[in-house]
């Protein structure tokens, strides 16, 4: 049993998207482009189209500029680099259904729901129609539209200010520890996402959900893909 909470009951929950609600992984695309050679694929992703390179697009850099710049550095890899943008839709996996079920519980209970995600402003419109649950959010802040990425505290403040949220009654859920730490430093109630059952227990402890399991979600676990990639 958790200790009784003396602080006010939270009134809003903010979700990260990639790795929490959406399974995103560039390997879904690049396994097709490196058939039978996972080692070469991993080298390409680690040394060419790196996470830091992708994060610059999440911060607002145009994809055309990103592809051109990287292709100039690695002309022998130009077609593979261009595929990251041209075939970006193939990096998307399924919704992480156990977490979607937790989100559905919150939605049906009337809690204010928001999303805060490191994501390119150019590619998010590709993803949005694929995941109907995104319509449950009162607001979605996409880093590429603002020009700031997590864990920069300015992005969290942008969310709080735009929607009039009190950090002390706002819950933030993210699978990235640095993003969770940044939220806590602003006084937000932050939860490091591990899996859907663990998340649900934390939300029960906060008084946001009742006891009892959501419809079948717990058995499925609810983490990201086995490769562990996610939008930041």
Each model region followed by its residue ranges:
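Asp-based, Mg2+/Mn2+-dependent phosphohydrolase catalytic module
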Residues: 1-13, 120-232
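N-terminal helical cap/lid subdomain that shapes the substrate entry/recognition surface
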Residues: 3-101, 108, 120-123
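Generic structural signal for small/hydrophobic residues in well-ordered secondary structure
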Residues: 16-19, 60, 106, 115, ...
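Alpha-helical elements of Rossmann-like donor-binding domains used by nucleotide-donor carbohydrate transfer enzymes
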Residues: 28-29, 52, 65, 69, ...
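Generic structural signal for secondary-structure transition and capping sites
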Residues: 53, 111-112, 208
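Secondary-structure boundary motif
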Residues: 72, 76, 105-108, 129, ...
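Residue-level marker of regulatory loop/turn positions in helix-turn-helix DNA-binding domains and
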Residues: 95, 116, 148
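Proline-centered loop/turn at the N-terminus of a beta-strand
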Residues: 112-114, 189
């Amino acid at each position: 049993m958790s200790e009784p909470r003396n602080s006010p009951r939270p009134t809003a929950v903010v979700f990260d998207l990639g790795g929490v609600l959406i399974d995103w992984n560039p390997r879904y695309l690049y396994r097709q482009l490196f058939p039978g050679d996972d080692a070469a694929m991993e080298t390409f992703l680690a040394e060419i189209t790196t996470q830091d390179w992708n994060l610059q697009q999440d911060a607002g850099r145009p994809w055309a500029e990103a592809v051109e710049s990287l292709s100039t550095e690695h002309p022998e890899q130009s077609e593979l680099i261009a595929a990251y943008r041209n075939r970006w839709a193939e990096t998307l996996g399924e919704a992480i259904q156990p977490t979607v079920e937790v989100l559905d519980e919150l939605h049906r209970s009337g809690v204010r729901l928001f999303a805060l995600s490191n994501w390119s402003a150019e590619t998010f419109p590709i993803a949005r129609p694929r995941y109907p649950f995104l319509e449950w959010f009162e607001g979605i802040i996409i880093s590429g539209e603002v020009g700031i990425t997590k864990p920069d505290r300015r992005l969290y403040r942008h969310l709080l200010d735009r929607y009039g949220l009190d950090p002390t009654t706002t819950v933030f859920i993210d699978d990235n520890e640095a993003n969770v730490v940044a939220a806590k430093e602003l006084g937000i109630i932050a939860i490091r996402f591990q899996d859907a059952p663990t998340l649900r227990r934390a939300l029960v402890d906060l008084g946001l959900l009742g006891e009892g399991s959501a419809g079948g979600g717990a058995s499925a676990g609810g983490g990201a893909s086995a490769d562990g990639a996610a939008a930041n």
